[in-house]
Amino acid sequence: MNTVLLGYECEYLQRTRGKVDGCATFYKKDKFRLEEARQVHYYQEGSSLTNRDNVGLILRLSPNSGEQGFCVANTHLLYNPKRGDIKLLQLVKLMAELDHMVPNFQSNPVILCGDFNARPHSFMYKFISQGYLRYHGLQLEDISAQRHGGGRKFLDIGLIPSNLTISDQCRYLEDHHVEMLRRSPVLRGQFHSYQSSPYHHFHYPQVSQNSGFLWHKFHMVSTYKHFIERTGEPEVTTQSNAADSSVVDYVFYSVDGRESKSRRGNFNNRNVIEGRIKLLGRLGLLSQREIKSAGNLPNFQNPSDHMPLLVKFLLT
């Protein structure tokens, strides 16, 4: 199918070091114009945490009708269930790139989508939805909740390599700001005190590194509920084999406010206050039982091991 004939423009980013796949975002050129495209390469020499070839892509689009624009971020994070530290660091870099591109998410809302290789209610999911995470002491295999037990490796406070120049707030440190921290004894003392302070989500320091905590400024909500109301079964977006189905693909969108609640391993957002982007509907997903009855994935109707996610928004 020729997407150009259908009226779409495409931004594509190939994975690094010659990998043939990558991330692509298509948009209707009669509806939107591209204001900026930002490529996110997670690969960076100098650390075993940044030597993977996954990528992300962020587009700032504006309606041709003249309304204010919005951003769409698309990514495919590392699969390896045992390396939750790498997945989390890739997510940190993506959020830092979004922070750089979107100074105010209320006037410039964000749609965040892709294959995050993390299950609902995992620590990765909670970080996106809550806006903060205490990662110090987490077991690597538990971060994405794709595999439990058997691991004996835990995250230390030094998750973010210094050469990334990203703070615990998922924000790039400007060179002059880094120099200011180095020169000022007062700020340097505050800087180091974050390593041991018992922060909660309502404590959001302006800048810190190696505190054992992460924050980001966006109020993100999943467009899917991760269970099927008509059957009460969990949703499925991918099937690696006939016995292993799960949700790893998501479409999040930024809202003006929400209450985040976590209870008994389940995570929910309540009292969501939508902003300029309003959720109108979504294409329903299937359960593992229903996919199995259809012949598992991939099959003739769905030639991929992932199910498509389709969401309808109103931009105001």
How would you describe each model-predicted region?
Residues M1-Y79, R83, G151, V251, ...:
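Structured beta-strand-rich core segments of catalytic domains in phosphoester-bond hydrolases
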Residues D99-I111, N117-T316:
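Metal-dependent phosphoester-hydrolase catalytic domains
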Residues N2, G22-C23, R38, G84-K87, ...:
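Short aromatic-enriched loop/helix-cap "lid" or pocket-rim segments at secondary-structure transitions
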